Amino acid sequence: MAYPFQLGLQDATSPIMEELTNFHDHTLMIVFLISSLVLYIISLMLTTKLTHTSTMDAQEVETIWTILPAVILILIALPSLRILYMMDEINNPALTVKTMGHQWYWSYEYTDYEDLCFDSYMIPTNDLKPGELRLLEVDNRVVLPMELPIRMLISSEDVLHSWAVPSLGLKTDAIPGRLNQATVTSNRPGLFYGQCSEICGSNHSFMPIVLEMVPLKHFENWSASMI
């Protein structure tokens, strides 16, 4: 999860987030090289006589500054499209969970089980226990099995919301009357926090999301106790 004065991204918990982190580093390297080259040329122009005021035509230069940006854009677009298709692909999900956004809480329904559904509200600051996180803890966590593909169906009962868990690389809009899909896969157990990421009213900041990823055996015990 995030911590104060953090400079980088949160630790990746899913294969998708690992790919997004690698793509971020890849793109940042390209931006850094371009920025360094531009600053170097500007510094040469200011400190030397590297100017050609009499040049009227330079076909070679124009060819280079046309082809080179196109190649750079291709180097950015190809991995981006690959990740985009990976995020939309899901085969044989082990579990399907329907998520509904409300003003201002989330409700969850495990569609593979009968009567396994609940609302998830933020715990007020005055009710927090020692060690719990302010504005991030909820009364009912979403318990899911780790290392299995899980399909999240996301929608809204009222206004636009957005279901986002950064460490899993997830951010999916919850739109009234529309059902969006996301894939959740966790490589390790633990608690993973997120929040509504679409301004949805006065209590928008009080819609946390908590996923508790556990081994399959623990999930089966939990689901049996909830039914």
UniProtKB/Swiss-Prot annotation:
Protein's job: Component of the cytochrome c oxidase, the last enzyme in the mitochondrial electron transport chain which drives oxidative phosphorylation. The respiratory chain contains 3 multisubunit complexes succinate dehydrogenase (complex II, CII), ubiquinol-cytochrome c oxidoreductase (cytochrome b-c1 complex, complex III, CIII) and cytochrome c oxidase (complex IV, CIV), that cooperate to transfer electrons derived from NADH and succinate to molecular oxygen, creating an electrochemical gradient over the inner membrane that drives transmembrane transport and the ATP synthase.
Keyword DNA damage: no
Binding site for Cu cation A1: H161, C196, C200, M207
Protein name: Cytochrome c oxidase subunit 2
Transmembrane feature ranges: 15-45, 60-87
Quaternary state and interactors: Component of the cytochrome c oxidase (complex IV, CIV), a multisubunit enzyme composed of 14 subunits. The complex is composed of a catalytic core of 3 subunits MT-CO1, MT-CO2 and MT-CO3, encoded in the mitochondrial DNA, and 11 supernumerary subunits COX4I, COX5A, COX5B, COX6A, COX6B, COX6C, COX7A, COX7B, COX7C, COX8 and NDUFA4, which are encoded in the nuclear genome.
Catalysis performed (reactions): 4 Fe(II)-[cytochrome c] + O2 + 8 H(+)(in) = 4 Fe(III)-[cytochrome c] + 2 H2O + 4 H(+)(out)
Gene Ontology CC annotations of this record: mitochondrial inner membrane; respiratory chain complex IV
The organism of origin for this protein: Berylmys bowersi
The entry's keywords: Copper, Electron transport, Magnesium, Membrane, Metal-binding, Mitochondrion, Mitochondrion inner membrane, Respiratory chain, Translocase, Transmembrane, Transmembrane helix, Transport
Required co-factors: Cu cation
Membrane-side (Mitochondrial matrix) residue stretches: 46-59
Record has S-adenosyl-L-methionine as a keyword: no
Positions bound to Mg(2+): E198
Family: Belongs to the cytochrome c oxidase subunit 2 family.
Superkingdom of origin: Eukaryota
Subcellular location: Mitochondrion inner membrane
Mitochondrial intermembrane-facing ranges: 1-14, 88-227
